[in-house]
Curated annotation (Swiss-Prot):
Assigned keywords, A-Z: Repressor, Ribonucleoprotein, Ribosomal protein, RNA-binding, rRNA-binding, Translation regulation, tRNA-binding
Family to which the UniProt record says this protein belongs: Belongs to the universal ribosomal protein uL1 family.
GN (gene name): rplA
The protein's name: Large ribosomal subunit protein uL1
Source species of the chain: Alkaliphilus metalliredigens (strain QYMF)
Keyword Ribosomal protein: yes
Subunit record text: Part of the 50S ribosomal subunit.
SUPFAM superfamilies in alphabetical order: Ribosomal protein L1
């Protein structure tokens, strides 16, 4: 295991590594341990008691964080006709069809964070499944990125909408803000995420749902959150 730097070691002294804190306490501590010279991203990591290999135990969705993430996402939209103008007016960074497919395939171009598509464009987008899928960029109705309401979709993403989904180890990783955010802003974003994940609990999930929860800054250590406190 690589040796951690002096700032990291100092950050460890700010809290008890063996203790699990309530969400609000964890937010206070994660701000204290974010000591890098840049504005670190604060992330939540949530391990769930489900098995993502089973279709009936998937946990996926999207929410608009009350205070955004501190980053304005670049949005690419697949649309045609009048929907192109709608997407552009809503603030989409890139709008197109086959031309964007060619650019992504030919140039290995990925200068965007979220992909949105109208349902009638999914045949075109499907050609990019092998490259968008592994990057978590494939549009999906559950996350609101396959829709004819492009104005709403683009504006919500620009306002701080984030998608959450399980990785192969049944963990959700979601940014909830920046170290420069006020504690109350981070706490509210964190609470909004936890409530959404709680509501998304699959009927097939058995036993303890929230297995472990932590928050961390880009360069800082993870702060454990008491799983029994996340729904309070």
């Amino acid at each position: 295991m690589p040796k951690r730097g002096k700032k990291y070691q100092e950050a460890l002294k700010q809290f008890d590594r063996e203790k699990s804190y309530d969400p609000n306490e964890a937010v206070v501590l994660v701000k204290k341990t974010a000591t890098a010279k840049f504005d670190e991203t604060i992330e939540a990591h949530i391990k769930l008691g489900v098995d993502s290999r089973h279709a009936d135990q998937q946990v996926r969705g999207a929410i608009v964080l009350p205070h955004g993430t501190g980053k304005t996402a670049k949005v690419l939209v697949f649309a045609k006709g009048e929907k192109v103008t709608e997407a552009e007016k809503a603030g989409a960074d890139y709008v197109g069809s086959d031309d964007l497919v060619a650019k992504i395939q030919g140039e290995n171009w990925f200068d965007f964070d979220v992909v949105v598509a109208t349902p009638d464009m999914m045949g075109v987008v499907g050609r990019l499944g092998r490259v968008l899928g592994p990057k978590g960029l494939m549009p999906n109705p559950k996350s609101g990125t396959v829709t004819f309401d492009l104005e709403r979709a683009v504006k919500e993403i620009k306002a701080g909408k984030v998608e959450y989904r399980l990785d192969k180890t049944n963990i959700i990783h979601v940014p909830i803000g920046k170290a420069s955010f006020e504690e109350a802003q981070l706490a509210e974003n964190f609470k909004t995420l936890l409530e959404a994940v709680a509501k998304a609990k699959p009927a097939a999930a058995k036993g303890q749902y929230f297995k472990s929860v932590s928050v961390t800054s880009t360069m800082g250590p993870g702060i454990r959150v008491n799983p029994s406190k996340v729904s309070e």
